[in-house]
Amino acid sequence: MPREIITLQVGQCGNQIGMEFWKQLCLEHGISKDGILEDFATQGGDRKDVFFYQADDEHYIPRALLIDLEPRVINSIQNSEYRNLYNHENVFVADHGGGAGNNWASGYHQGEQVEEDIMDMIDREADGSDSLEGFVLCHSIAGGTGSGMGSYLLEALNDRYSKKLVQTYSVFPNQMETSDVVVQPYNSLLTLKRLTLNADCVVVLDNTALNRIAVDRLHIPNPTFAQTNSLVSTVMSASTTTLRYPGYMNNDLVGLVASLIPTPRCHFLMTGYTPLTVERQANAIRKTTVLDVMRRLLQAKNIMVSSYARTKEASQAKYISILNIIQGEVDPTQVHKSLQRIRERKLANFIEWGPASIQVALSRKSPYVQTAHRVSGLMLASHTSIRHLFSKCISQYEKLRKKQAFLDNYRKFPMFADNDLSEFDESREIVQNLVDEYKACESADYIKWGMEDRGKQVSGEGNTSGTVDSRVGAS
């Protein structure tokens, strides 16, 4: 029984990475650019209907909504060779087409104004599913539409589809370069609040690390957005292979998420992938084995989150959970031996209060895509060092806030009217609590962490702001 997943692509970045994702899925399932099953795609065994549905004329249509407040990226998709792939009823571009001006408050406010139109589209897709499992949101946290409207949609999905899983692929800005979006720290912090409270699982796509990997591993001196988006689509398609080519384990989104997230708040995942297909020099000399792939996945240089490779406290940081999705010709006994070797060499430092084991899901490769490697692997991991990424967001926010810089841009919108900046303060508190919780995960007595505060809240003492506490223990 397929468990369908609806994808929401929001904003410029969300639509660009979403487009690459659908290109990759079409290749892997033998679907043409027009949505027609290719003559050679006869092997079966895959579940196309998790991400696609079949129209009356047998075309495969993505279960996707393309949403933006300005038309440029969606126009380019509608004029591309994949223009006949999408359901045109599932495309939303704001009438004025003026965008959100890189302002979270504008994106959020416009989300409120067009909620009915977008929720109608979501409801229609949901009603067309036999057994809807959840939603995937693709967006950036730094701009205006992906962050602001994306935040509004996360809250709306939580209200209307509270029993469905919400997973996000969230692109974090490059922190090594000066951004042309001066209010990026404000946008990021406000979005992080919603990702903490309203998502069940967040796959962090860190542009800082993606650029580093493109330069260091793929030897691309000045990576373009298209090249980093190609890395993102590789991660997205690999992370969904067990749903599309089901095996014994992790063949639905609930199973995938449950195995990785033992505590509800710590639901931010980092990824690693090897071997990267553009590493041409390595193609000739590397023999990919399960041990080689699993060992490389634990190396900092292959992790797609910058905080992992850059922290001084790396020795204290620990894995909360690891799931390796291994694709290709793999003998399960090789997996067992590889796990033993990794354990003997102590290559992964785990938390003390949970199972210190790497979970492995074996997945078939698409028979329609030729790759140079026998075995490839994706690591999805929860790791306490990710808190440094959030700490960086807080410190960048505080630099701007101290100067009271650019706040007038936000005061124009209802949430911040009458100089009410409590939303900023609340968001900062929630993100700081998240940082503290990841830090607490490193200690053996984490299970007791926060109990005193929760006791106070139950008895009516302490923080009564509601928003912070109402979702403790639930995500």
Swiss-Prot record:
GO terms for molecular function: GTP binding; microtubule nucleator activity. One of its GO terms (biological process) is cytoplasmic microtubule organization. It is found in: Cytoplasm, Cytoskeleton, Microtubule organizing center. GO terms for cellular component: cytoplasm; gamma-tubulin ring complex; microtubule; nucleus; spindle. Keywords: Cytoplasm, Cytoskeleton, GTP-binding, Microtubule, Nucleotide-binding. PROSITE patterns: TUBULIN (PS00227). Residues 455-475 are annotated as: Disordered. Tubulin is the major constituent of microtubules. The gamma chain is found at microtubule organizing centers (MTOC) such as the spindle poles, suggesting that it is involved in the minus-end nucleation of microtubule assembly. Belongs to the tubulin family. This is Tubulin gamma chain. It comes from Physcomitrium patens.
